Amino acid sequence: MNESDTRLKLIDPAIMESWDRNTQVFTEYFFTSGEIVVRGSMVTRKDKKKADYLLMYAPGIPIAIVEAKDTEHTVDAGLQQGMGYAQLLDIPFAYSSNGKGFVEHDFLTGKERTLAMDEFPAPAELWTRYSKAKGLEHPYSQEIVTAPYYQEHGGNHPRYYQCIAINRTLEAIARGKNRILLVMATGTGKTFTAFQIVHRLRQTTEVRKVLYLADRNILVDQTIDGDFKPLKRVTTKVVGRKLDSAYEVYFSLYQQLVGENGEEIFREFDSEFFDLIIVDECHRGSAAADSAWRKVLEYFNCAIQIGMTATPKETEEVSNITYFGEPVYTYSLKQGIEDGFLAPYKVIRPKLNVDIYGYRTEEGTVDDRGEALPKRVFEKQDFDSEIVIKERYEEVAKRITQFLKETDRYSKTIVFCVDIEHAENMRRALVNENADIVRDHPTYIMKITGDDREGKAQLDNFIDPDEKYPTIVTTSKLLTTGVNCKTCKVVVLDNKFGEHGMTEFKQIIGRGTRICEDYDKLYFTILDFRDASRLFADPEFDGEPVVVFEPNPGDPIADPGPGGNGGSPVPPPPPIVDPPVLPPDDPSSHVKYHVHGADVYVVSEMVQYYSSDGLLVTESLK
């Protein structure tokens, strides 16, 4: 009997004896989207992963995997495959069957046993075993871990990793833990995950009042109008010092609770007012021992506190893990790319001569503003923070424009700069390189920084996939985190990564990792002018690029595509530690020189792919 008949005639009846076909049994269950593979201009997807049977105790609470084989196979022939799926899906029981019996692997005990076809466990039996092993038998715990998910006909359903994050969070709370850390890569739906956690907890007697903390208005507004929209009737945004107790879900900027001069406004509210606090992008300071935001969390210490971030910060001064504890779940950038939920990327590295050899100034000369120049060689990390070389940022703008002309001039592009002045210089240089479009469409290129009201007013248009303009934006820090631009196809790195380089690097890479197939966005390209891609070799980084390309002067800047015979592996370069970065926008901290007349050009080209063993394989050299 073949596998289809075995399932239909033998395995299905055995399972359906005690499991509901419509709500608990899911056959041919696909749980990944298939990794996106990019080779030159060719884009394909690998096969999706699927389980023969996924069994759920309740919607969103998977409990068992069953892999089926035909009657010619042994009863345990599918067990290891099922175990692999169960581990990935965080499921406690895996089964294999050939229609003549079942073999069970219990991840809770590590033991295996064989079962007759009429001995397949019922949902209540598996749930009881699971609850006992996890210490969730108490009625209080059961109320929390079985609270229903929000389900809307035609709406979003949690992906497998979101279910894991949600279920592990509720289980931790059910066991009495009140500080919880979730680490999920940018673009994997942290706010949707947070919404489901809030919704489920609000179905219990444990949680009524919820505070959602963020550090930017755009993040708050996106969340209220997006994933949290089903709760809008009971939701309010904190304005000033007012906290209307008639609402149940409160969104607030950190700044609304802590004044500019350190006033502890939050103390006007009862310390037990909130039952649950969600800390969005918690790496951005809430865990610092001397942070004002830490004071907010410690004041409301009776509340359950959940920190969410793509990049937990661990330094001598700041530790998310010390405050929240080890993450209850981590879903990495690498895993998101492998599952096909995040976009892979190419890297193009134009090497500028001044970046390689430095820029020498002589004592006794002055810059464009009359400042006396020192005798020294300025290096790459000094450009645009210590010294501004007009020809350098103009060459960068020229290469960005060249790439867009060779690919698509209307690809949404973010250019990350050293500081606000650099962002303005880059905007002007890009305008001059693209005057043919800017003449008719002045918002084709915009600077969006914290000090620019006009630029920030265009942020919603940049994010909107149906709005063509702005197409290119220059920024320093404002767009580093949280801003959801699904159609961003180009990320330009002309900034610096200092003390917390890896955290910021991951956040910036995350600006492009969202997939938007309706707008032909399956991968994105990084133009790296600062050697930031050295961080790919850092052990902390977990999502390698699919290609690295270094163009020669005069050559097309777009990736030429596959070629050659594969070449040989080249070990990745060692990480380079930047010197401390001075605050770029504080004019009193240092003198910034401005010069022009330099000869700036691109000097090299290399195309490299990352192999499956993590080495760089050289495809071509020029």
For the regions a protein language model found, what residue spans apply to each?
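Conserved RecA-like P-loop NTPase helicase motor core
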Residues: 72, 256, 446-550, 554
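ATP-dependent helicase/translocase motor core
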Residues: 1-209, 214, 218-233, 245-249, ...
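Long, largely alpha-helical accessory region at the distal end of helicase-like NTP-driven motors
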Residues: 152-155, 168, 381-391, 395-399, ...
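Interdomain helical connector at the RecA1-RecA2 junction of SF1/SF2 helicase-like NTPases
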Residues: 318-411
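SF2 helicase catalytic motif II
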Residues: 267-307
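Structural recognition of the conserved hydrophobic beta-strand(s) that form the central parallel beta-sheet
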Residues: 96, 250-253, 304-309, 473-474
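Conserved C-terminal RecA-like helicase domain
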Residues: 248, 376-473
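Catalytic P-loop NTPase motifs of RecA-like helicase/translocase cores
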Residues: 72-74, 220, 257, 284-286, ...
